[in-house]
A protein has these predicted regions:
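Substrate-binding groove of N-acetylhexosamine-processing glycoside hydrolases
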Residues: 1-209
Length: 209
C-alpha cells in the first residue's frame, strides 16, 4: 500500500509532523496489507516522525486513536536521539510539532488537525476581541504562557537538538517560531494594555520590551 504522506510536494512551506490516524487507520485487518510505503516530505530528516509511526503500525496495527497518539508522543525521542529516554530537546520538538501538521490547503489534500489543545482558546479570544467583549486576565495569561512555551521550545531545540541534521532542515521553521511567538506575546500584551486603558506610552513599552 502506497500512502502519499507526509509528502509536501504541493505545499513546500509546510512541515507535516503528524497525521498518524488520518493515514494509518486503527483496527485495519492485517491480512489485507502486505506492506506500506510512504511518500516523504521535501525534508528527509523530519519525515522520520511519519516513518516511526509507520514502523509501529506495521509491527502491530494500533486499535485506537489513543494508541496512535502514544506512538506519536514517543516518536520524537527516537527521531531526535534514538533513545527511550526523553530529553528537553525531544520534548521541545514534539511541542512545536503539535502546531506543524496541517498543510492548510484546498481539497487536493487531506485536512489534518493541528494546535488541537490551543485552537479553541485562540478562537474564544478572537471572538471576544471582534465582539468587543471583555477578555479576562486569565485568558491573557493563558495565551501568553502558551506562546512563551513555544518560544522556549524553539530556543531549546535549536540549542540542544540531538540530531543536528533535523535542526538544519527545519531551521527556517524555527526562525518562524521565534518571530511568531514574539509577535503573539507582544500583541497580547498590547491588547491587554489597551483594554486596561493604559497610557499610549505605556502600551508601547509594554508590547515592545
Amino acid at each position: 500500500m502506497w500512502i502519499n504522506w507526509p509528502c509536501t510536494d504541493n505545499s513546500k512551506k509546510h512541515l507535516i509532523m503528524g497525521g498518524y490516524t488520518t493515514f494509518l487507520h486503527p483496527g485495519v485487518d492485517p491480512n489485507k496489507i502486505q506492506g506500506i510505503v510512504l511518500n516523504p516530505m521535501q525534508q528527509s530528516e523530519p519525515s522520520k516522525v511519519a516513518i516511526f509511526g509507520n514502523a509501529c503500525y506495521s509491527w502491530n496495527i494500533w486499535q485506537s486513536k489513543e494508541e496512535a497518539q502514544k506512538c506519536w508522543n514517543a516518536s520524537f525521542k527516537y527521531v531526535d536521539h534514538n533513545s527511550a529516554i526523553e530529553t528537553q530537546a525531544s520534548a521541545a520538538l514534539r511541542e512545536l510539532s503539535k502546531h506543524m501538521i496541517n498543510q492548510n490547503m484546498d481539497g487536493r489534500v487531506t485536512a489534518l488537525q493541528e494546535s488541537v489543545d490551543l485552537k479553541d482558546r485562540l478562537t474564544s479570544f478572537k471572538e471576544a476581541l471582534t465582539n468587543g467583549t471583555t477578555i479576562s486576565d486569565e485568558q491573557f495569561k493563558d495565551l501568553i504562557n502558551e506562546f512563551t512555551i513555544l518560544k522556549n521550545a524553539s530556543a531549546t531545540y535549536r540549542a540542544q537538538a540531538g540530531d543536528i541534521r533535523i535542526k538544519d532542515q527545519i531551521v527556517y521553521w524555527l526562525n518562524c517560531w521565534d518571530d511568531t511567538a514574539d509577535a503573539a506575546i507582544n500583541y497580547l500584551k498590547a491588547v491587554k494594555a489597551v483594554q486596561d486603558e493604559e497610557a499610549n506610552d505605556k502600551i508601547y513599552w509594554t508590547s515592545c520590551f
